[in-house]
């Protein structure tokens, strides 16, 4: 079947080609079976062993090529070394420069250095076309004595054309002159070689310095330039050596030509140039601003406290007291100043609360705050009259009567009623506090007046103080009982905090262990702080009583001013030491609660990662976030604040 099909295919292809040729087309290619046969033969031969053999042969061929390449490089390097060696040998062969010159001129002495130098100079000039015919067949003398009468037919003419930087009168000496080649600038092409005598040049410069008149170079720029030009000689006289060593004195010519003069620097003028109206600039002169010294915050705070105390002392109408205990102002002035007294007391109470709640970092701050508190207590110690105490007690009774009448009329539960009740409660507390403080000041000031006048306290004043203390204690007990009864159960109408405390007490809201521990720590800290303040108050009370005893005993009357100051200093040191000991004992039970919080410049609390990024990394490297990140962060802060401002309900 296969053979018949192949014959039919071959016949069909041949017939097709015959038809295509008759039509004038290109016949089909019949050689398709040959590449298939070759491919089949190659596939048969390409076995695994043949591939390994071919790979080995390729590797051997590559290794041989590498070895041949290395050998070729070694041979090239050897040939290069030999070529360089032969080149060096070729260059070193032959005669040296000294041998060549000696052969050219056998008459020149090898030890004569001057003759050799002149020979070299002549040869270099001959190369440039400007040389002199040096034909020194005789010995070149080291010292030349120049005389015009010695010129003869057999004189050496090697110096013909050279110039001497001296006049004929200077050269006409019997003992002769030693001429040397003058130093010249190698960049100055116009300068020719000159012969000069060193001694004559030095003598000439010395004489010129003596003849020069002193001048002031900073007076004017033009004068300075004229004087500098006068210092430099513009003209010079020289002598030329002619044929057969004949001397020709040349006329004076300019030594420094303006066209050929070369300056290798900048002329600096120390004179301030005058600016005309057209040359004036719009720029202002730079002024150095001195930095002002900034005052520290502590100095400013101290100054503010002192100013407040001075203003209180100046504006207080009760500062001036007569010996009989009456004020120098009448009753109307006292009534007008009642508001001012209340404002002043509120300020003092606020300042005392700030001092009490202040945390002391070290002993220095503690001593400063105690001294400030002592000064404020001394400044606000004023005399309080019995009439004022009675008036304040009467006002307190009227307030209590008003509250009783309001409560008896009935109960009205609304926002206005709650607001008014809260105001009255605060007024009652402030009134009670002011009564207690005034009674304390009254007793203290009465003792002060008695000690100043030298009289003992009267029975009437003692009775008045006892009555006021009894009334104050009674009112305080009543206020405490009312406050305890009111604080037994929080009112729902007060605020959200009262509602939360009520729900917490009833057990509706459960408190977590962490919150309980935090609340317990806060309570322990508050108790510790209260004990600390109570101990300090008791110590101050003992100190005050001790001072009163010393004042009443008459101890200070026998002392001088200096002894009083020393005694007061010792007492202050003793009490300060005692306060420090009490503080140290109290700190044994102190357990600080440390809570580290990171806050950025916008007041936003940060986590540890953000704090490291913004507060440490950016500040250390001195760079911040980009514009896009900063705007995104600000938008997030604004959105967070907007969410917090939304109402709860």
Swiss-Prot record:
User: Which stretches does UniProt call biased (Polar residues)?
Assistant: 43-56, 448-461
Residue spans with biased composition (Acidic residues)? 307-317
Q: Which InterPro entries match?
A: HIND, SNU66/SART1
* Region of interest called Disordered, as start-end residue ranges on this chain: 27-61, 78-98, 129-154, 286-327, 433-464, 541-570
Q: Name one GO cellular component term.
A: spliceosomal complex
Role of this protein: Required for efficient splicing of pre-mRNA.
- Name by which UniProt lists this protein: U4/U6.U5 tri-snRNP-associated protein snu66
Q: Which organism is it from?
A: Schizosaccharomyces pombe (strain 972 / ATCC 24843)
Q: What is the lineage of its organism?
A: Eukaryota, Fungi, Dikarya, Ascomycota, Taphrinomycotina
